[in-house]
Amino acid sequence: MTDEEYMQRALELAMRGAGWVNPNPLVGAVVVRDGRIIGEGWHPAFGELHAERQALADCRQRGEATEGATIYVTLEPCCHTGKTPPCTEALIEAGIARVVMGAPDPNPKVDGGGVAQLQAAGIEVVQGVLVEECQEINRAFFHYIETGKPYVILKYAMTLDGKIATRSGKSKWITGEEARKRVHADRQRYAAIMVGVNTVIKDDPLLTCRLDSFESSDVEELQVVDESDFEDLLEREMAEDEAAFEADLEGCADSTLRGFGTFKPRCSNPIRIICDTRLRTPLDSQVVRTAAEIPTYIATCERDLEKHLPYRERECDIIVVPEAAGHVDIEILMEKLGELGIDSVIVEGGAEINWSVLAYEVVSCVQAYVAPKIFGGAAAPSPVGGLGVEAPKYAIELSDPKVTQLGRDLLIECEVK
């Protein structure tokens, strides 16, 4: 196998941490000696061992010696002590002879320091193998490290004639099951989901990841859980999680370490953020009623603590932000979310909040799910409302699209320039 093939395997392993490592990066590692994989690992969750240490531990579990081996890792090994000890020390102590690296780590605590430490210890370091792929899986992490603000994805589903609902406001379902699986995989992967209060009032959504136990790296295996079953699922989770996880570990293959089994016991719900300028979120809404189980923030311009109290009693957190043009100041909100450690946000609101996040220039990526259907109707809403631009030359410019077919639907993804 080539360096690229081993790195591709490390990328697959890295994705198993999706939804669990935030605000840390996704990282995978593969240890190879004499053309044979002797250990594998990935960063399974925030605060747990990093991929390199997991892979070295896997080698020990298998009874394999690491002296003179090569390790393939998707991100530059860390060289500082945070929640866990530095990985560079572990690699040096393990006698690793060669480190093949994907992307450099822009974290100021690393930023080339990992490479320097390894080279100073006489370890050969090869950089830039599948670097674009390694950067792609951590685009949210890189953005957060460089700006201190969340990586924002604007997501919507529409018909081929650009409608997100019929003239009567009905929208279930525009896209098919494969597209909806992908949406929930992203809810698993990214830290938070944000909507406007009008969406809460109109649709009363749960804003959860409705995927049952699944392997994070394999979207094709995801199973959708009906929203109507979610409250029952929450109750079962409390009783079943520990037992289910232990059962998973008992059933792991010998080569899989206890503590980071192949399958996650339950899906990971995103943090929920409601933009609510005047604090109108209904107290009996599903997001408020389930705030004790799922972290829920309400961003508002309302400063009256008496009005905050009913929400706080139901375990919602209130974020007070300034008002701008009659709405929550989105730019200030993003700064506050960054301070809370939220590295990524999916915006799944209606036309007005979609325009707001675009107008404030906080969006990094646009995801448009397009179904081969036509709704028609002048009263049927489009994905982006607001004032809009005056002339084509003022359009918000996007990158060349990446197009993925999901069943009969298309996912069109563009970065905002």
Which residue ranges define each predicted feature?
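A broad detector of short, well-ordered amphipathic alpha-helices
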Residues: 8, 12-15, 39, 50-53, ...
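Helix-turn-helix
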Residues: 28
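Structured loop/turn residues at beta-strand edges in well-structured enzyme cores
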Residues: 64-67, 94, 147, 188, ...
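Generic structural signal for helix capping and beta-alpha/helix-loop junctions
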Residues: 108-109, 135, 354, 376
